[in-house]
């Protein structure tokens, strides 16, 4: 039986661990933290599973493989919601919406009443839009917790340690999933900046 050590228990490490367990491997997860939390990039992820929208600027493999992502996450967790993606623009920006449509697939055009049905809070504000019905989103923190629990429940082991990948590699198959922390080995590695903003203002529509 194949045995593998995975260093890093963020989203990448957990996905690798789950996939290897599903193929009958013995898996050990090693991370310097006991649980997922604010220290991990994936803790702050938006959770969009929107490969067709990503296709506006992403390469073909992102779209092709991304189309499988919602099914995978739905099979492994209960964190997925399939409600589609709605893209709208102000009247003065309809050329941008048309450009977005030219660069993407997997959508249908929607008019004002359809937009109102999809998103009542947008009623009477937009005359046209694009609806990517097959797209989804997940709750990242719930997904991380459930994926970790399933890995441990199905025989995966966990070691809390600030691991040296080179040391583990001498013992056997080792997969480095430390993310940005791997910059000590991959000197040109860079992070992708993102922001999360949560707004709650019930009195303003």
Predicted regions and their residues:
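Extreme N-terminal leader/targeting segments of oxidoreductases
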Residues: 1-4, 128-129
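N-terminal Rossmann-like FAD-binding beta1-loop-alpha1 element of flavoenzymes
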Residues: 3-28
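Short beta-strand/turn micro-motifs composed of small residues
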Residues: 8, 31, 89-90
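Glycine-rich FAD pyrophosphate-binding loop
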Residues: 22-41
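Short loop/edge segments at beta-strand edges and connector loops
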Residues: 31, 111-112, 158-163
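Dinucleotide-binding Rossmann-like beta1-alpha1 core, especially the glycine-rich loop
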Residues: 46-118
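Helical element adjacent to the flavin cofactor pocket in flavoenzyme catalytic cores
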Residues: 126, 130-173, 177
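Flavin-dependent oxidoreductases
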Residues: 171-205
